[in-house]
Structure formats: C-alpha cells, structure tokens
A protein has these predicted regions:
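Short, basic alpha-helical nucleic acid-contact segments in DNA-binding proteins
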Residues: 107-112
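Long, well-structured alpha-helical subdomains associated
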Residues: 115-121
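A positional/architectural concept
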Residues: 2-3
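Active-site scaffold of zinc-dependent metalloenzymes
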Residues: 8-65, 76-80, 84, 89-106, ...
C-alpha cells in the first residue's frame, strides 16, 4: 500500500489550511525522496519526511529529522502566506530562498526559547 493511502502521522493547521504530515516514508514509496530528505507539496497540502536511509552518515538522525520537518513547515507557512506561486528550486532568485528557510528552521528552537524566557509568547 502506498503511504498516501494511509492516515497521515499528523495533521497540522498552517494559517488555516490543514497539512498532512507523513514521517519515515521509504524513498521507494515516493520518487521525490530519492533526491531529498523531505518536501512540502503546496498542491496536495502534504509534508513528507524520508525514513532513515540504510547508509546513514549522521550521528543523530532523529535531530536531523526534526530539523527537516521544521524546514518543510517553514515552506508550508510561506506557501500559505502567498509566497510560492511560481517556485522553482534551481533558478537564482527562487520564491523561497533556501538559505533563509534553512536559517529559520535551524534557529527557530533558539528563538522560541528566548521568546519564552522573556514572556513574549
């Protein structure tokens, strides 16, 4: 059975739009995962995160998987904010500058901690 025929691991609300999240999806079940560890599909409102590859060089896969999930959620927020109508990932000046998406995904836990410490949440 293909993973999209199953219940998602979770559904989240992204600016009023439900996104289904599928985690630990084998690359054999989704050809897009052959080239990446996760993606956000704005047309189907799905976030898909790959399973741990057999040839994994990372010492802490779980931490990396959480980072990939945060990264794809940032894309979902950008899509639902109206940024992403003509997204192309291989052209300079793309709709979602990957370096900024990466920065937000990496730094958000630290930003959240500071916001919580100062009572800004």
């Amino acid at each position: 059975m293909n993973y999209v025929e199953t219940e998602p691991d979770r559904v989240v609300n992204v600016l009023g739009t439900p996104y289904a999240i599928y985690v630990d999806v084998p690359a054999a079940d989704d050809e897009l995962l052959e080239a990446c560890d996760g993606y956000c599909d704005k047309s189907t409102k799905r976030i898909v995160i790959a399973e741990k590859p057999k040839e994994n060089e990372l010492g802490d896969w779980e931490s990396y998987r959480r980072y990939v999930l945060r990264h794809e959620v940032v894309h979902a927020f950008l899509f639902e904010s109206g940024h992403g109508g003509n997204t192309t990932w291989d052209i300079p000046g793309e709709e979602h500058p990957e370096h900024m998406v990466e920065w937000i995904a990496m730094q958000f836990p630290k930003i959240l901690k500071v916001y919580q410490e100062i009572g800004a949440i």
